């Protein structure tokens, strides 16, 4: 999955627009996310392992907010021939086009239906696994309960939702510490202070992270009885909920 180096915010911008998953971002996304999200590679790898354990024959897998298809590829490699279909959805046409190229580079018996659309409009049915990999944080907070409810209803008994997100923390000291560690991570990966500052400004109005408690409360309120935080590095985490 090739990608150019992310230099989107390397030059000073007079007016910083809100972050969007356009052609410019799609072209550098693989580099951007791996230099910005600690543990991203581990999360992607483990999605495949979870799929191997939980995806059942003749079911659907949903990758909601699929971007370049990293999660879909990891899942497809691990589930083998189970007569399943993966439905990979993103609202960015640029992401979908590049995802199609990435998927085409690997031969598999598992078909992938690529959908350019709003995940809030997608029907979830006969699902054994649903993935929201750093997606929900970009949804309007008022839309999140309804999405989780739809996912829960569309999952088969024993099916899983894997939810990866940046987290907020109620304890301001913990928030400050983990923010600082994350900034150090980005600096160590070659981002300048200008890039970090401008990227933060672009995300300010479009990314609204929840706390871990908010995620757990939402999932259990919609019916999930089993919930676990299986991965965390700094203020980035991945959770699994089982129906």
Swiss-Prot record:
Gene3D superfamilies hit by this protein: Vaccinia Virus protein VP39 (3.40.50.150)
EC number: 2.1.3.-
The organism's place on the tree of life at top rank: Bacteria
Reactions catalysed, as given in the entry: prephenate + S-adenosyl-L-methionine = carboxy-S-adenosyl-L-methionine + 3-phenylpyruvate + H2O
Main enzyme class: transferase
GO molecular function: carboxyl- or carbamoyltransferase activity; S-adenosyl-L-methionine binding
Binding site for S-adenosyl-L-methionine: 40, 65-67, 90-91, 118-119, 133, 200
Pfam families listed in its UniProt record: Methyltransf_25
SUPFAM superfamilies named in the record: S-adenosyl-L-methionine-dependent methyltransferases
UniProt keywords, alphabetically: S-adenosyl-L-methionine, Transferase
One record GO biological process: tRNA wobble uridine modification
Family recorded in the similarity comment: Belongs to the class I-like SAM-binding methyltransferase superfamily. Cx-SAM synthase family.
Subunit structure: Homodimer.
Primary role: Catalyzes the conversion of S-adenosyl-L-methionine (SAM) to carboxy-S-adenosyl-L-methionine (Cx-SAM).
UniProt name for this protein: Carboxy-S-adenosyl-L-methionine synthase
């Amino acid at each position: 999955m090739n990608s150019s180096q992310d230099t989107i915010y390397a030059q000073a911008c007079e007016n910083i627009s809100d972050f969007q998953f356009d052609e410019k971002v799609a072209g550098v996304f693989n580099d951007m996310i791996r230099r910005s999200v600690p543990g991203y590679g581990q999360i992607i790898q483990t999605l495949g392992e979870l799929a191997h354990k939980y995806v059942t024959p003749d079911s659907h897998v949903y990758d909601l907010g699929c971007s370049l298809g990293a999660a879909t590829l990891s899942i497809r490699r691990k589930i083998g021939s189970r007569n399943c279909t993966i439905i990979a959805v993103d609202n960015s046409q640029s992401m979908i086009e590049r995802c199609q190229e990435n998927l085409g580079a690997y031969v598999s018996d598992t078909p992938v239906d690529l959908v350019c659309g709003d995940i809030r409009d997608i029907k979830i049915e006969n699902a054994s696994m649903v993935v929201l990999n750093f997606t929900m944080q970009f949804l309007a907070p008022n839309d999140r309960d309804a999405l989780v409810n739809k996912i829960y209803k569309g999952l088969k008994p024993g099916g899983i939702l894997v939810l990866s997100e940046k987290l907020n923390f109620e304890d301001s000291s913990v928030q400050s510490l983990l923010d600082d560690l994350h900034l150090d991570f980005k600096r160590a990966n070659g981002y300048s202070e200008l890039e970090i500052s401008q990227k933060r400004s672009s995300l300010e109005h479009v990314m609204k992270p929840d706390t871990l408690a908010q995620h757990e409360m939402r999932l259990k309120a919609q019916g999930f009885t089993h919930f676990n935080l299986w991965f965390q590095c700094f203020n980035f985490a991945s959770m699994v909920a089982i129906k």
